[in-house]
């Protein structure tokens, strides 16, 4: 009887695990949150992380396409862009970077070489950077309301300069 109960519990755990694994699989291109069809008539901008997509979309609405380099759920410290992302990046007019995260420190030179006409905007310009207890700069600038205000101002200014309509 105990062995039968053990097998039922073990089977249930295995089935639940398989269901969870399958549910976590994604369709579409994760770097653009599944938005496959970008409007070719709209300018395209690229951001490093999802919170910055939100900022751009709140400022520009549907007037620009927004690509995200580090997909939701990926680590911005260790993520490596896909070849397709590098191709798509060349269509961006702007790259709105966070300023101090690992992905940008590692990849920014290569991203700029790949898209030499793309203008890189450091959205942390004007933000007083905080240091962690270990003395490193805290890259999570968007978490502060004051800093988010500066970030969105930097984004809005760049977009208005290039796309005044």
What are the functions of these language-model segments?
Residues 20-165:
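Extracytoplasmic metal-acquisition and chelation regions
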């Amino acid at each position: 009887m105990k062995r039968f109960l053990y097998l039922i519990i073990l089977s249930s755990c295995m089935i639940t695990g398989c269901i969870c694994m399958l549910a976590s699989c994604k369709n579409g291109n994760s770097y653009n949150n599944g938005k496959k069809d970008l409007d070719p008539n709209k300018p395209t901008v690229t951001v490093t992380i999802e919170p910055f997509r939100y900022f751009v979309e709140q400022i520009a609405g549907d007037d620009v396409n927004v690509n995200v380099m580090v997909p939701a759920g990926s680590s911005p410290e260790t993520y490596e862009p896909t070849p397709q992302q590098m191709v798509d990046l060349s269509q961006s007019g702007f790259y709105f970077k966070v300023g101090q995260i690992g992905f940008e420190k590692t990849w920014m030179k290569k991203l700029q070489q790949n898209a030499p006409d793309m203008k890189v905007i450091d959205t942390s310009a004007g933000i007083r950077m905080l240091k962690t207890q270990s003395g490193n700069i805290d890259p999570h600038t968007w978490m502060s309301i004051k800093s988010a205000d500066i970030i969105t101002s930097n984004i809005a200014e760049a977009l208005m300069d290039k796309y005044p309509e």
